[in-house]
């Protein structure tokens, strides 16, 4: 613990300042914009085959352009990694969540989220993932990850998230 003297001879301890500095490092984001979890503080620590491994090392989300269900090259790269992981660990079932940004009506965004979820589901099926392992759900604009009236928030909310529901049976390794 560091101490210093201030005028008047009173000792001031800087432990709180040091602790705050260390705590700020722990607040780093664990996901990159492409959905992979290789941001600062992530990677490698997750048990292979665990849900944390999927999120941190594979990436659980893909992003879409405004009013679109088209997969970008970044999205297909993430989905290829998801398909590979899901083939390696076949005991998992999962839900593909479709989301939209806050612009547009509730009904339209619900439909757009459903189409985004279906696009991801179809892509994973085309990569050999069994349909009986997948389900889709749309949240439309009801579950934003970022809330503000700005493109930086809207782009984070136009997404599909692959959520592992659970595992059954023996490990698929």
Identify the function of each model-found stretch:
Residues 2-16:
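Bacterial N-terminal signal peptides that target proteins for export
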Residues 22-26:
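C-terminal motif of bacterial Sec signal peptides marking the signal peptidase cleavage site
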Residues 28-93, 165-173:
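Periplasmic peptidoglycan-binding/tethering modules of Gram-negative envelope proteins
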Residues 74-81, 107, 111, 115, ...:
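Extracytoplasmic/secreted proteins, especially bacterial periplasmic and envelope-associated proteins
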Residues 90-99, 114-145, 158-173:
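A non-catalytic structural micro-motif
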Residues 146-150:
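Short beta-alpha junctions and helix-cap segments that line functional grooves
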Residues 152-156:
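A generic structural micro-feature
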